[in-house]
């Protein structure tokens, strides 16, 4: 995404993290404390239109009219706390899809986890890999590929080769560039046409956010999908 430098910054809710290359400050966002946003910025809307064409891994129907893009890091404790809330949210809202934007910013080995997940996606095994990686304790390593492949029913040789491929690196770099452009300095961060929310959002608040997305879409305000 080519764009000017971001003009807004998200509110810091808590700090766990480090400075990574390029000067991006990475942290894990604490549990949600701010009110729900009333709408997305122009930059966020532009991103949502572009992200709909990026073939991001998806939870839910690929053609669902409501879209929530999740920026996350496998080392983020609040991402781990949020993760089990998403399948029941999508099950309760069949018009919703969650797009996963791998955002490995907290530790150097976070990128290894993201590469393994996207390599699993190439074999149609993203969601099982996503769940498995969140259950890992400690550091991520390419030595985990055989265990991951066995757990999710993937080809380990193909997994190892794909995770080192240029398309995987490009996809992760694209997510990092987009997040920095948007001013996302913490995980988890969720974007929709209603705006951005951060942190370990409890299920009732997630449902409220989805209901606001649906209401806006029904009213013809900020459509969720590009024409």
Where in the sequence are the language-model features?
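A generic local structural motif
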Residues: 53-57, 84-85, 176-178
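Conserved strand-loop elements at the edges of beta-sheets that form or border functional pockets
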Residues: 61, 70, 199
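Short secondary-structure boundary/capping elements
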Residues: 49-51, 81, 171
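C-terminal cap of thioredoxin/glutaredoxin-like
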Residues: 3-25, 150-227
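N-proximal helix/coil linker or "cap" segments that precede and/or mark the start of modular domains
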Residues: 29-47
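Structural alpha/beta surface segment adjacent to cysteine/selenocysteine redox centers
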Residues: 64-75, 80-151, 182-185, 216, ...
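A short beta-strand-turn-helix
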Residues: 48-66
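Flexible, active-site-adjacent loop/turn segments at secondary-structure boundaries
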Residues: 46, 56-57, 101-103, 132, ...
């Amino acid at each position: 995404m080519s764009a000017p430098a971001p003009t807004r910054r998200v509110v810091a809710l808590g700090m766990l993290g480090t400075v990574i290359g390029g000067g991006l400050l990475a942290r894990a966002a604490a549990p949600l404390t701010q009110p729900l946003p009333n709408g997305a910025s122009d930059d966020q809307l532009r991103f949502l239109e572009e992200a709909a064409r990026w073939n991001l891994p998806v939870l839910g129907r690929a053609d669902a009219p409501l879209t929530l893009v999740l920026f996350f890091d496998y080392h983020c404790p609040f991402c781990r706390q949020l993760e089990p809330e998403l399948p029941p949210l999508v099950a309760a809202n069949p018009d919703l899809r969650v797009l996963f934007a791998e955002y490995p910013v907290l530790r150097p080995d976070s990128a290894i986890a993201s590469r393994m997940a996207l390599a699993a996606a190439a074999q149609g095994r993203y969601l099982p890999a996503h769940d498995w990686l969140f259950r890992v304790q400690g550091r991520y390593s390419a030595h985990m590929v055989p265990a991951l492949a066995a757990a999710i029913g993937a080809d380990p040789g193909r997994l190892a080769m794909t995770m080192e491929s240029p398309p995987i690196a490009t996809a992760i770099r694209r997510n990092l560039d987009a997040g920095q452009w948007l001013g996302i300095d913490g995980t988890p961060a969720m974007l929709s046409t209603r705006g951005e929310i951060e942190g370990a959002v409890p299920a009732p608040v997630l449902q409220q956010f989805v209901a606001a997305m649906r209401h806006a879409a029904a009213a013809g305000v900020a459509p969720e999908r590009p024409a």
